[in-house]
Amino acid sequence: MLNAHAPVDVAMIGFGAIGAAVYRAVEHDAALRVAHVIVPEHQCDAVRGALGERVDVVSSVDALACRPQFALECAGHGALVDHVVPLLKAGTDCAVASIGALSDLALLDALSNAADAGGATLTLLSGAIGGIDALAAARQGGLDEVRYIGRKPPLGWLGTPAEAICDLRAMAAEQTIFEGSARDAAQLYPRNANVAATVALAGVGLDATRVCLIADPAVTRNVHRIVARGAFGEMSIEMSGKPLPDNPKTSALTAFSAIRALRNRASHCVI
């Protein structure tokens, strides 16, 4: 059946592993048109070469040929200030994947104020974890406790404070490398903060959400677990996520979450 409506004009912020996967998934979707891609200046030529003249590839919001209807951020924390804030101020609805950055209250306020000023909507993607819809719904009746437990293979914690806690290259048994609030987890482990921050913002907040991070030689994937209780009852959900085929460090579900956000934007019936 032919699409009776004009496609939604989309700007993508970032064209790394997630951005490229999202673009490939919706490239031929009649309800969507990725007409703009915003990337750092040094990446523009390569992205133009990959996408051709049909996409407006620029390095700033000011350089866009026209204002998009919707923007999807999958570029990392810095892009929220540089690109999402001005887009929201201009009235463009945005969905963002870099939730971990929102542990910074000043940034969260800046995004909220920009959305208010532009009359736009900011959507936080669920990313690599499921159950966020249930958790956010349960919050309406009151939550007594929310915990997030994250497990990764030891080498997945290289380059983090975990290196000072244990020998990540020679572990025989699991070891807890962090216990505390979601806010502290985001500050100490910024590259691993998106899931914990998403759980916190959907539930009882960054300070009340308890986080446990574990280096576990028995797992080969990133394992996420949410435990919650409140007026709704109790909930426990665990996910063992696969990476994108062409990028072992990137959750496939994060890309699928972004694809869903785009298709929901173009749909008249949304779940």
Curated annotation (Swiss-Prot):
Its EC number is 1.4.1.21. It catalyses: L-aspartate + NADP(+) + H2O = oxaloacetate + NH4(+) + NADPH + H(+); L-aspartate + NAD(+) + H2O = oxaloacetate + NH4(+) + NADH + H(+). One of its GO terms (biological process) is NAD biosynthetic process. SUPFAM superfamilies: Glyceraldehyde-3-phosphate dehydrogenase-like, C-terminal domain, NAD(P)-binding Rossmann-fold domains. Pathway: Cofactor biosynthesis; NAD(+) biosynthesis; iminoaspartate from L-aspartate (dehydrogenase route): step 1/1. NAD(+) binds at A128, N194. The active site is at H224. It comes from the Bacteria. InterPro entries: Asp/hSer_DH_NAD-bd, Asp_DH, Asp_DH_prok, L-Asp_DH, NAD(P)-bd_dom_sf. GO terms for molecular function: aspartate dehydrogenase activity; NAD binding; NADP binding; oxidoreductase activity, acting on the CH-NH2 group of donors, NAD or NADP as acceptor. Belongs to the L-aspartate dehydrogenase family. The iminoaspartate product is unstable in aqueous solution and can decompose to oxaloacetate and ammonia. Specifically catalyzes the NAD or NADP-dependent dehydrogenation of L-aspartate to iminoaspartate. This is L-aspartate dehydrogenase. The lineage of its organism: Bacteria, Pseudomonadati, Pseudomonadota, Betaproteobacteria, Burkholderiales.
